[in-house]
Amino acid sequence: MSEIKVGKNESLDSALRRFKRTCQRAGVLSEARKHEHYEKPSVKRKKKSEAARKRKFK
């Protein structure tokens, strides 16, 4: 979990912006989206191979 410490003279907006940035870097939202629905192992393998194919031919 991302955690930030708010400074004495720091506004709530800047602290929220900093928190969102740390969450983005940690990949919190992307992980949550991945685990939103169950994905069968066969589907995971298929997506992984398609992504590798895209990287290879790009």
UniProtKB/Swiss-Prot annotation:
Which Gene3D superfamilies has this protein been placed in?
Ribosomal protein S8
Provide the protein name.
Answer: Small ribosomal subunit protein bS21
Family statement drawn from the similarity comment of this UniProt entry? Belongs to the bacterial ribosomal protein bS21 family.
Q: Name one Pfam family in it.
A: Ribosomal_S21
Question: What is the superkingdom listed in this entry's lineage?
Answer: Bacteria
**Where are stretches of biased composition, namely Basic and acidic residues?**
31-42
User: What GO CC annotations are associated with the protein?
Assistant: ribonucleoprotein complex; ribosome
Q: Name one GO molecular function term.
A: structural constituent of ribosome
Q: Does the keyword Ribonucleoprotein apply?
A: yes
- Entry keywords, A to Z: Ribonucleoprotein, Ribosomal protein
- Provide a GO biological process annotation: translation
> Which portions of the sequence form the region Disordered?
27-58
Which ranges are annotated Basic residues under compositional bias? 43-58
